[in-house]
């Protein structure tokens, strides 16, 4: 190998390292901001990270372990995988990986695959039943482990897809919440990747070379409604840079007085002479001002290099 080739290789390695460092910082910052904004993790928490073997849950576990090292509070992490007894599922991969990184873990074995195949006719979508079965098992496991938070690997794109699915097929303006409490009030579920882009997670997963396990039960089913919406959003992202970022921002900037739900805004109670703070009533006859370009740009399109954000404001349990 000549000197020029060695120099070129060195420069390429530096570039790869620089880009990975930038990517990791962005994911750390996004996860840290989500944790702070929604008070996801508190001092003394035991966080049960649900690990499926996919890129999202691997990234979630990796970033949380990374943040734990510098967090101003103490919290514990336990990784949990639900072995659903799918034919050909490589049972050795996750235990080997989790032991290699030294994290506490538990493998829960439940034949949900058999139940789903028995109950759902061939060709029908199994997602709904599979999800309900998993939820019940994970709630039970969290109680057994003494976990105070259950962390799932859903990201920003999942939340947007769910928003559109509910609008298109359910007639609801509803997405995935970044934090929720179970119906019985006993479990709190968090989604620390809520601010993270799927394409960032994909790049990070490839760089870290996580041992990905494909899902043959639900994710491989063709013609799912979610896949159609996903492809629609990906097309928009390619054709209109910044649109996805602006749409997600819209989920955090809601004007109830300009929607149509009387249970959320007292339209009937509006009377002459009232002055309502924070209600944009005076612009009712104005033409909506729609900017030509998205208000928020994709960070990949920006030239600014991002350094470490300020200390994450975890809160303490009283």
Swiss-Prot record:
- Cellular component terms per the entry's GO annotation: cytoplasm
Q: Which domain of life is it from?
A: Bacteria
Q: What class of enzyme is it?
A: transferase
What keywords would UniProt list here? 4Fe-4S, ATP-binding, Cytoplasm, Iron, Iron-sulfur, Magnesium, Metal-binding, Nucleotide-binding, RNA-binding, Transferase, tRNA processing, tRNA-binding
> Position of motif PP-loop motif?
52-57
What the record notes about the co-factor is: Binds 1 [4Fe-4S] cluster per subunit. The cluster is chelated by three Cys residues, the fourth Fe has a free coordination site that may bind a sulfur atom transferred from the persulfide of IscS.
**What cofactor is needed?**
Mg(2+); [4Fe-4S] cluster
Looking up InterPro entries in the UniProt record yields:
Rossmann-like_a/b/a_fold, TilS/TtcA_N, tRNA_Cyd_32_2_STrfase, tRNA_thiolation_TtcA_Ctu1
Instruction: Classify the main location.
Output: cytoplasm
Gene3D superfamilies given for it?
A: HUPs
From the UniProt record, give the pathway where this protein acts: tRNA modification
What's the Enzyme Commission number for this chain? 2.8.1.-
Tell me which residues bind [4Fe-4S] cluster.
127, 130, 218
Sorted alphabetically, the Gene Ontology BP terms of this entry are:
tRNA thio-modification
Q: Which cysteines are joined by disulfide bonds?
A: none
GO MF assignments: 4 iron, 4 sulfur cluster binding; ATP binding; magnesium ion binding; sulfurtransferase activity; tRNA binding
Location in the cell: Cytoplasm
Per its record, the protein catalyses: cytidine(32) in tRNA + S-sulfanyl-L-cysteinyl-[cysteine desulfurase] + AH2 + ATP = 2-thiocytidine(32) in tRNA + L-cysteinyl-[cysteine desulfurase] + A + AMP + diphosphate + H(+)
Family membership, please give it.
Belongs to the TtcA family.
Q: Which PANTHER family match?
A: AMINOTRAN_5 DOMAIN-CONTAINING PROTEIN, SULFURTRANSFERASE-RELATED
Give a short account of what the protein does: Catalyzes the ATP-dependent 2-thiolation of cytidine in position 32 of tRNA, to form 2-thiocytidine (s(2)C32). The sulfur atoms are provided by the cysteine/cysteine desulfurase (IscS) system.
Complex and partners: Homodimer.
Further information: The thiolation reaction likely consists of two steps: a first activation step by ATP to form an adenylated intermediate of the target base of tRNA, and a second nucleophilic substitution step of the sulfur (S) atom supplied by the hydrosulfide attached to the Fe-S cluster.
Instruction: Name it.
Output: tRNA-cytidine(32) 2-sulfurtransferase
Which species expresses this protein natively? Actinobacillus pleuropneumoniae serotype 3 (strain JL03)
Lineage of the species this protein comes from = Bacteria, Pseudomonadati, Pseudomonadota, Gammaproteobacteria, Pasteurellales
